[in-house]
Amino acid sequence: MSAAADVIVLSSSPDRIPNGSPVLPAHDPAKLFDLSPPSASSSPVRSPSELFQISTRSRFFELETPSRNKENKTPKEPPVRKVNTTSKAKSASSQDKPKRRGRKPASESQTVLGDSGLAGLAQQSAPKKTAGARKKRVDSEGKRGKATNRTIMGRVAKSGNVQAKPPQEKIMDVSTPNALPPTKPASGVVSLEIDGLQLETAMKRRIDWTPTKDTTARTVESSQQEVAEANPQSFGSLLSEYGFNDISSAQSDVRNLGDDGPTKRRRIELVDSRLFGSSKPASHDIDDKNLTEDSQQKQPEPKQKPKKQTKKFTTLTARVTASYLNNSHEGSDSSSKETTTSRENAATSRTRGSKRKGKATSKPKEPEFIVLSPEAAAKSLENQELIFGTCSQLEREDSPTSLKELQAAISESERYAVAEPSPLSSTLCATPTSRFTTARGLWSVAARDLEGSLIRQTEVVDLVDTPEPAKMTTSTNDSRNEKALEDAATVPPKEPFDLPKSEPPKLKAIPAAKKEPSPAPGMPTIKASDNLKGTTSQHSKPQPKMPNYNGFTDAELSRQVASYGFKPVKNRKAMIDLLQKCWVSKHGKGTTFETQAGSQNTSTEPTPVLTSSEPNTSQKQPRKTATSRKTAAKSKTNPDSNPPPKINSRKTPSSSDATKAPSIQSKPTQPPPIQSLSNVEEIEDSEEETLPSPFRIQNRYTPQPPETRQALPVSKTLYSPSRPKPRTTKSTTNNSATLNQKQPDLADQIFKAMHAQPAGTPSRPSWHEKILMYDPIILEDFATWLNTEGLGLVGEDREVSAAFLRKWCESRGICCCYR
């Protein structure tokens, strides 16, 4: 029994024994069975080892089976094991290690006793072994046998050593199926009472994770039912509480959710995202009157805050916007008050409350329209809002019809300009020059069309009453030319200096008519006006006459083709045919016959052609001021086409006297046309000086003044058939000389020709594209292109050499090379 006493002492004092405790079990399996320690052995190895371990460790299991059958104490001990398995968790492995060190020596000391053969001590120390040593060995065997279950259960909770033992229950069920199932409910009750605080807290923690979700789900279901019952109430409260009910609603949410303690913040976030609409009606149903009183106490507070801020405003913008801020706060406060009253009522009354909101917002606007007393009106003027902006903007806001009036005025001006837009602009622009002394304000200067014509002078012009634009232009020309003739009788030299300020086409008409009546101011004015009237009356019929494109140079033909929007054509005949077709399609077919009749009648009387050619061109050029090429082309055809009707108009005074009388001044009817002839020639000389770029038709008559002066006393019909043909030859030579003298620089012409070339393809780029891509330009190819095609696009007849192109390229930094 001394050894047994030693065993009891060792089990009660585990602190000294761990020094010698690892030595005994380390020798036992090595000496007796030559086996590794049981922790490293696998589960199939245990079945043979248990046969050999009867004397040491397996003896206790064998002793238990008869003790269970014989004694009543033993069935109470394994349920203690089951209670430990069901109640405790595995996570406190740190607590297991000191217990193993304290309780393993007891088992090892018992093995020593087993060697001595004391079986009675095992039965006497059975309650101690069941409480201390047997529990730990069951734990160690459970850990050795099923480590996977131990690791899985250990991660869930680490408060106790108990969760390593539910797998042991299954093992014990396999070994002893009859004894275990009836003992489970009793063991569960005993374990809750024995184990104490740790078990209770662990069970609550395991229950809290799932049932808390169930509790929240129940609140959600109840709140959803309430929402389903009171949807209009919640919707109205949501709309009404956007303004100032955020504080009260947030506090109500905190009140509903403040019972759960540590998870306040999380549940507030969930309520804000999911249950925002449902929590409010629940809180209103619980605390109807209390919340309305709280909201009424809290809602006047935001009224006071903006009032304090309005007193602190010092800036101009703050003062201007203060009224709007007050109105917005008042509107929101009134709406919040109505929502609090609507919460007390039923759903129908709440919908009516929403209608009352709209009425309440409209009610403060009604007294603004009431007629005020003079004092109140003066006060309202003092409190009037400041409006920033220019007066022009305010005028346009006050007069919305100004745009309509302006559009109507523009449309009226466009009606006159539909057929011929240029004559209107020319006449309107000519009015300030003829009335140069009139005062001109900024408005008169600024009120102009896109073409530069004055908008407001459409009403001032005397010709507004005339319905047709053609008649209007003729009447303007007649009235102005008559005034100009009357002025020219008094001061002839000053008018040409004043008139160039207007458009250049007017230069030809007015001075030509002004210098006619210089010797006899009375009678010639009538004839000049008659001539002008004859020409203007004829403009309706012979105005669109086809020019003689055969007399044009290649450069002029190319310009005409380009003006119609066609690409340049190399062949001269093709260009002439194309221009004729374009002109016929634009002006009509009936005019071509007039050109033929005019060309046949030119042989009868060429000298009056000189008299009438300039006024005709002057009347036509303002109509075609868009392009100077067309004016030149039409002025060329005037000597061939215009004379026959004018000869008929002038045959009454001068047909009998021109052939018979050699002297010019024999009769009073004849001198004005003769003097007009000489004056017209002088005007042509002056035009050469004023016009910077003379055309072929204008230069055609430059060598004529001496010839015509010599031919004037002679009969007019003698030189008519032979005169026009040599003129064309001389004019071509003289024209080429003058063009060569006044042609622009050839380098600029090359640059223009290069830009005039149409865009090429990626395989064959244009010369300009090659230069942009820094491709080396072969001088010979570039020269051949310029001489054959390029310079013809610009109307240049000169040719270019490769050496000149090399200088041109080097001066502009263009990469070039010879072939």
UniProtKB/Swiss-Prot annotation:
UniProt biased composition (Low complexity): 36-49
Annotated region described as Disordered, given as residue ranges: 1-187, 207-370, 466-553, 591-741
Function comment: Regulatory subunit of the slx1-slx4 structure-specific endonuclease that resolves DNA secondary structures generated during DNA repair and recombination. Has endonuclease activity towards branched DNA substrates, introducing single-strand cuts in duplex DNA close to junctions with ss-DNA.
GO cellular component: Slx1-Slx4 complex
Cellular compartments annotated: Nucleus
Coiled-coil region(s): none
Residue spans of biased composition, Acidic residues class: 681-690
Biased composition regions of type Basic residues, renumbered to the chain: 352-362, 621-633
Protein name: Structure-specific endonuclease subunit slx4
Transmembrane intervals: none
Quaternary structure (record): Forms a heterodimer with slx1.
Compositional bias annotation for Basic and acidic residues: 59-80, 256-272, 282-304, 495-506
Post-translational modification: Phosphorylated in response to DNA damage.
Assigned keywords, A-Z: DNA damage, DNA recombination, DNA repair, Nucleus, Phosphoprotein
HAMAP family: Endonuc_su_Slx4
The family this protein is said to belong to: Belongs to the SLX4 family.
Example of a GO biological process term: DNA repair
Comp. bias intervals (Polar residues): 83-95, 212-237, 313-329, 337-351, 532-541, 592-620, 650-668, 729-741
Molecular functions per Gene Ontology: 5'-flap endonuclease activity
